């Protein structure tokens, strides 16, 4: 009689294990179903830099609206200006946001404070996105947004592509790096942050003199010329008169750098908003750095 008793014991044990596996699987399925149900179904983005993320992470049918800047072409300030056509856009206000019946409003922290206060009073769910000051910040923010928007796999895919861009930039960057300055509309000289990181990865060492920057972050043309960089990247369009802010990029005094500095215009839209797509500018920086390194002698005439 011992054998049958042992058989029944094994049977009960096997059944317990099978039941445990079934319960585990069912719990996992329930969790996934809850996660899918919890993903926001009508997302409104109120700022250009949140548009960039929402468009990439949220299916079109779940995007209730992006900001008008996402598809603006006067000028183009978005990397998704063409791809996002057909999606509803708004000029963010309490009225325009509520008209889209959102179940989540994605805002950049600190932007449009009055709208933020009004939506909070009305109980509208808000996701505040912090500004990224480094590529490390980009990783944290992208992962967070992937979780909050129900798209963790998409977020990780974006970061994986960013890492591939970083590897490509490093592999082709000139060594030692080229001494360069990024001079932007109104005379702003980019210093620090993600732009500096992308430049460095691409083989450009930012030599804009911090001590010569004004309180507003602009660099006087005289200080720029005195720095005599190997590479001067003029951030924007080459055509004169496209906007008053671009006039300084055509300053006649910059002619003093001819023969010793490679000067080139470059549209760097991916750097306007920090995110994994910012690495798309690495190829532009790298190409300019290699050209500056291979250029003939730039000794002053």
Description of each model-found segment:
Residues 42-110, 114, 204-207:
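A short, structured surface patch at a secondary-structure boundary
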Residues 67, 75, 194-216, 236, ...:
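His/Asp/Glu-enriched short active-site or ligand-binding loop at hydrolase and phosphoryl-transfer sites
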Residues 35-40:
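Boundary at the C-terminal end of the N-terminal hydrophobic targeting segment
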Residues 41-58, 154-204, 296-301:
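Basic- and aromatic-lined ligand-binding clefts that recognize polyanionic substrates
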Residues 23-33:
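Bacterial N-terminal signal peptides
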Residues 41-42, 137-147, 156, 236-301:
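Structured C-terminal subdomain patch of bacterial secreted/periplasmic proteins
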Residues 13-25:
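Bacterial N-terminal signal peptides that target proteins for export
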Residues 85-95, 132, 212-221:
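Short helix-initiation/N-cap motifs at beta->coil->alpha
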């Amino acid at each position: 009689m011992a054998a049958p008793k042992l058989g029944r014991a094994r049977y009960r044990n096997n059944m317990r294990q099978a039941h445990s596996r079934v319960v585990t699987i069912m719990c996992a399925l329930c969790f996934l179903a809850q996660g899918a149900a919890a993903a926001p179904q009508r997302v409104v983005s109120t700022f250009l830099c949140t548009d960039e993320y929402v468009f990439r992470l949220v299916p079109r049918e779940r995007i209730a609206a992006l900001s008008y800047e996402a598809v603006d072409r006067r000028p183009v300030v978005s990397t998704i200006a063409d791809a996002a056509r057909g999606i509803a856009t708004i000029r963010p206000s309490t009225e325009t946001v509520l008209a889209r019946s959102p179940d989540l409003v994605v805002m950049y922290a600190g932007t449009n404070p009055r709208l933020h206060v009004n939506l909070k009073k009305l109980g509208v769910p808000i996701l505040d996105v912090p500004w990224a000051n480094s590529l490390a910040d980009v990783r944290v923010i992208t992962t967070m947004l992937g979780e909050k928007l129900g798209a963790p796999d998409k977020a990780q895919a974006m970061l994986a592509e960013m890492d591939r861009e970083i590897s490509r930039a490093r592999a082709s960057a000139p060594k030692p790096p080229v001494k360069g300055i990024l001079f932007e509309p109104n005379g702003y000289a980019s210093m620090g942050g993600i732009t500096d990181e992308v430049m460095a990865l691409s083989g450009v060492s930012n030599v804009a003199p911090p001590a010569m920057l004004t309180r507003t972050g602009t660099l006087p043309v005289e200080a720029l010329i005195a720095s005599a960089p190997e590479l001067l990247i003029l951030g924007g369009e080459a055509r004169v008169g496209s906007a008053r802010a671009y006039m300084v990029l055509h300053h006649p005094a910059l002619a003093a750098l001819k023969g010793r500095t490679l000067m080139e215009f470059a549209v760097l839209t991916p750097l306007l908003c920090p995110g994994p797509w910012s690495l798309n500018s690495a190829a532009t920086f790298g190409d300019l750095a290699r050209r500056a390194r291979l250029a003939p002698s730039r000794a002053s005439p």
